[in-house]
Regions:
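Conserved active-site-adjacent core of cysteine acyl-enzyme catalytic domains
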Residues: 1-132
């Protein structure tokens, strides 16, 4: 993992959670995140669009689907699903039965139970290439 502090980023609009999470990951890795100008969105970003945004910044990212969460992928951007709505958070830590997340909807980092995380997690996550290989 990077030697940088955990970075909390608050999303600017209802549809910016993915971009806020990507920015948090970039800053965690000590990377500059230059978001290109964009029109007002009427929907959120797909994981593929976030993958492409990382690529446009010159950073290699990987998207995975899994039925069980692998703590070796931390830190990573994950997709949650709650009441039919998608939401992105960054997973920054793990301890017995708890997952540490950065939630851009509130702009802070906190712990949730692993049970709650598993219930909400869609099985999708995005990982930036290791800093040493960037």
């Amino acid at each position: 993992m990077g030697g940088y502090p955990l970075i909390s980023v608050k999303q600017q609009s209802f549809f910016d959670c993915g971009v806020a999470c990507l920015k948090s990951l970039f800053l965690y890795h000590g990377l500059f995140f230059n978001l290109p100008r964009r029109k007002k969105r009427l929907r959120g970003y797909s994981l593929y669009e976030l993958f492409k945004l990382a690529d446009q910044q010159g950073i290699q990212a990987f998207v995975y689907r899994s039925s069980s969460f692998d703590v070796d992928c931390i830190p990573c951007l994950v997709q949650l699903s709650h009441m039919g709505l998608g939401h992105y958070v960054v997973v920054y830590g793990y301890r017995v039965n708890q997952i540490q997340i950065m939630d851009p909807s509130v702009g802070r980092i906190y712990w949730i139970s692993e049970t709650k995380f598993q219930r909400l997690w869609s099985g999708l996550f995005l990982v930036l290439a290791d800093k040493n290989s960037l």
